[in-house]
Every structure is written in structure tokens, then in C-alpha cells.
């Protein structure tokens, strides 16, 4: 995906950034949020808390990446789909109001193409993770996730 275009676009629009330290949370599952976040620098972990209180890691994301784009494009507020915690020493995020972000997307063909590719990639990764979880034991799942992380680092 053309991450450069997204980052350049946000820079040109002078979108403010948010800095977070290691292990700080950007969002919590279920909390209302008004902004879309784009990870500019760093690594974050997305997770949810299971009913029994254990944390279930969904994925690790490295910059650049869109963090909170899931859900609809017209609501000013939406609930966070997962927890987002900084795993690197620090992380920098662009913070843009959701409605404003979608207005930009709807007016810019190149940005629309980027978002479409983003959704396709996210869907593909979600299906892959689901396959791993349903077909393998927990130990094998962890090994597969580790291999996937190594693959992502090489990209």
C-alpha cells in the first residue's frame, strides 16, 4: 500500500500529532472516540479483554498504519473496537476527527484507493488469524503469529 501518500497528505493538511510513551494506551475497547489515528512512528499492540479477564492480543502494528478506521464513516463518535497500547519506546500518531478524515477520503481518489486497499488487507489478515485460531493449538498459534511478525518486519 502507498503509505507515503497518506503520510504526505496528512502533513500537507497540518494534522496534529499525539506522542505516547511505552505501554501507554491510545484507546480502550468500547470507549467512545471522535478521532481516527494514524501511526506515524513506533509499534502498537491491539488487544481485547476476554470475559475471564485475560488479555487476547489481536495484532502488532508498526508505523505507518491506520489504527482506528474500522466502523462507519458518518458517525462523529464511535466505540473503539479494541485496546491500543504502545509497545515501542514511544509512538507518534496523527489525530484527525473521524468526519473530517472521511470528508478528505471522499474528495480524494488516491486516498480512496488507499483506504480500499487498507480494508482489503485488514480483511485478509483477519481471515488468516481466524484460520490459525480455529485450526491450531494455542502453542502453534503463537508460533504462527511470531512467524507472521517476522514476515512483516521484512516488508
Q: Where do the language-model regions lie?
A:
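Short, small/polar residue-rich loop motifs at catalytic or cofactor-binding pockets
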Residues: 12-13, 31-33
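Cyclic-nucleotide recognition modules
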Residues: 59-116
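Polybasic "coupling" helices that flank or enter modular domains
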Residues: 109-155
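Local beta-strand/beta-hairpin segments that build beta-sheet-rich folds
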Residues: 26, 58-59
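Short phosphate-coordinating micro-motif centered on Lys-Gly-acidic
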Residues: 24-32
Amino acid at each position: 500500500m502507498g503509505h507515503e501518500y497518506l503520510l504526505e497528505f496528512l502533513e500537507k493538511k497540518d494534522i496534529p500529532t499525539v506522542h505516547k510513551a511505552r505501554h501507554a494506551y491510545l484507546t480502550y475497547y468500547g470507549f467512545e472516540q471522535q478521532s481516527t489515528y494514524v501511526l506515524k512512528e513506533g509499534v502498537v499492540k491491539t488487544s481485547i479483554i476476554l470475559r475471564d479477564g485475560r488479555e487476547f492480543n489481536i495484532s502488532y502494528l508498526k508505523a505507518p498504519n491506520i489504527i482506528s478506521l474500522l466502523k462507519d464513516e458518518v458517525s462523529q463518535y464511535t466505540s473503539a473496537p479494541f485496546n491500543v497500547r504502545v509497545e515501542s519506546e514511544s509512538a507518534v500518531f496523527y489525530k484527525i476527527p473521524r468526519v473530517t478524515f472521511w470528508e478528505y477520503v471522499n474528495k480524494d481518489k488516491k486516498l480512496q484507493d488507499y483506504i480500499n486497499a487498507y480494508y482489503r488487507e485488514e480483511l485478509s489478515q483477519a481471515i488468516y488469524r481466524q484460520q490459525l485460531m480455529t485450526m491450531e493449538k494455542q502453542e502453534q498459534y503463537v508460533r504462527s503469529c511470531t512467524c507472521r511478525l517476522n514476515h512483516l518486519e521484512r516488508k
